[in-house]
Curated annotation (Swiss-Prot):
This is Iron-sulfur cluster assembly protein SufB. The gene is SufB. Participates in the sulfur mobilization (SUF) pathway for iron-sulfur (Fe-S) cluster biogenesis. As part of a complex consisting of SufB-SufC(2)-SufD, involved in assembly of [4Fe-4S] clusters. Exhibits ATPase activity. Pfam families: SUFBD_core. The keyword Plastid does not apply. The lineage of its organism: Eukaryota, Sar, Alveolata, Apicomplexa, Aconoidasida.
Length: 470
């Protein structure tokens, strides 16, 4: 037993973001009821529409139930005994804290000069860098609750229009509790050449992060948005329930990147973060929405970014890498709803399952009767290696228009011993050989990331494989 404990401690040392930041925090821990909403809304009572939005969501809570169609049992979460709000007290020096505790080393680097970054720590935004030139263009990129104070009519107009509090169980809970997030508004005829980024970090034990992101892209506009996520290491699990709403108006274009490296738990499946996220966008005439995501962390992932192609000639692309191992479960995929005519969608998914992991891909393509000459192409490729690895593909196609066309392809393969043998004959170790094969398998997707992150993904994969096979 002592040897096993020491072994797990060594394994956990390899998780880069395991450190916990010792800092004074204001915490709210109580049951999921109206008193919690009042505590969370104490500073926004001037804007009753937010309070009412949360209150109406609470009234519908008992209507919903946890999904019962998953390949895994949803964890039994005690919603009366978790921390719903965690914020840094004002007596802390935030910049000193960031540089010395959070280990965010890019604050003084060239990277921040080409990005506008919002850093959300637990339940509050602790650093926001909005470039002066963005303000001159009329671009609004601020923490969600700053927007509520500064532009309440804008929030009232768009909040919950794409993902209602009636949508599903987790969307309903987020609508009750959401405490922070990001808001982005790109005016019409504006091409944003800066990368807008949000970094989420959960730090407190028994903490649940409920953030909400809302992005509006105006007519003939363009923006690139990236979110990154990490979590501290605890024996107890943490919870992350998020909502992302995206509205792309006529001729608009957005690239939405996601890099998630939450804590994945130990080799026995203890600890780790539960990630339940609802993401959805709507595209109007001639607009385009790209989802590009890389999933590495979290013990359980439940996420299906989807697009409503409402306008004619609208396009949506979904590119995903899901890389899991050692008791991790990823139930992910995408949904494409074709409503307008001449719409196109592409779903390209790459999943890698190593040692005792479960990877599920669900793809829904729905083409309505009045969506003429629309097209979808779905390709799901899976790679498995090690003991007790499982990958599952569940396509679901509804095509109600005989002028529209859907194409589906799926591949499952394993890392052949002969390939490893050939690489090891040339001086590579077992972990280096596996890394080379996996990186080559999914390079066409991570190459779509911005240059700075494109370089880091192979390193991240190599480190994870080295932890497993060395």
């Amino acid at each position: 037993m002592i040897k096993l404990k020491n072994f797990l401690n060594i394994y956990n040392l390899n998780y880069k973001y395991q450190y916990k930041n010792k800092i004074n925090l204001y915490l709210i821990r109580q049951g999921l009821n109206i008193n919690l909403i009042k505590n969370l809304s104490s500073n926004i009572f001037l804007y009753m529409f937010i309070y009412n939005f949360k209150k109406y969501s609470l009234k519908l809570l008992n209507i919903f139930k946890l999904p019962d169609w998953n390949f895994f049992d949803c964890p039994n979460i005690n919603y009366d005994n978790i921390i719903y709000y965690s914020s840094i007290l004002k007596d802390n020096n935030l910049i000193y804290y960031l540089k010395n505790n959070l280990n965010i080393e890019f604050l003084d680097s060239i990277l921040i000069k080409n990005n506008s970054i919002d850093i959300i720590f637990d339940s509050m935004s602790i650093l926001h860098t909005t470039q002066y030139f963005l303000k001159k263009l009329g671009i609004i990129f601020l923490p969600l609750f700053d927007i509520i104070f500064k532009y309440p009519l804008l929030i009232k107009k768009y909040l919950g229009t794409i993902i209602s509090y009636k949508d599903n169980f987790f969307a309903n809970i987020n609508s009750i509790i959401f405490s922070e997030g990001s808001f982005c508004y790109i005016p019409k005829y504006v091409k944003c050449n800066f990368n807008l980024s949000t970094y989420f970090k959960t730090n407190s034990s028994d903490f649940a992060q409920f953030e909400r992101t809302l992005i509006i892209v105006g007519k003939y506009s363009y923006v690139s948005y990236l979110e990154g996520c990490t979590a501290s290491l605890y024996k107890e699990s943490q919870l992350h329930v998020a909502i992302v709403e995206i509205i792309v108006k006529d001729y608009g274009y957005i690239k939405y990147y996601t890099l998630q490296n939450w804590y994945r738990g130990d080799y026995l499946g203890n600890g780790g973060l539960y990630n339940f996220t609802t993401k959805r966008g709507i595209c109007l005439n001639y607009s385009k929405l790209d989802w590009i995501q890389v999933e590495v962390g979290s013990i359980i992932t439940w996420k299906y970014p989807s697009t409503i192609l409402k306008g004619k000639f609208s396009i949506s692309n979904f590119y995903s890498i899901s890389f899991i191992s050692n008791m991790q479960i990823a139930d992910t995929g995408s949904k494409m709803y074709h409503i307008g005519s001449y719409t196109k969608s592409y779903i390209i998914s790459k999943s890698i399952s190593l040692n005792n992991s479960l990877n599920i891909f669900r793809g829904l393509v729905y083409i309505k009767p009045f969506s003429y000459k629309s097209y979808n192409y779905t390709e799901c490729s899976s790679l498995i290696f090690g003991n007790n690895s499982l990958t599952v593909t569940i396509p679901y196609i509804k095509n109600y228009n005989n002028t529209s066309y859907v194409k589906q392809e799926a591949f499952v393969s394993k890392i052949e011993i002969i390939y490893l043998f050939l690489l090891m004959q040339r001086g590579l170790s077992i972990s280096e050989s596996i890394s080379l094969l996996i990186i080559g398998f999914c390079s066409d997707i991570y190459n779509k990331l911005p240059f700075e992150f494109n370089l880091e993904i192979p390193i991240l994969f190599s480190l994870k494989i080295k932890d497993i096979f060395n």
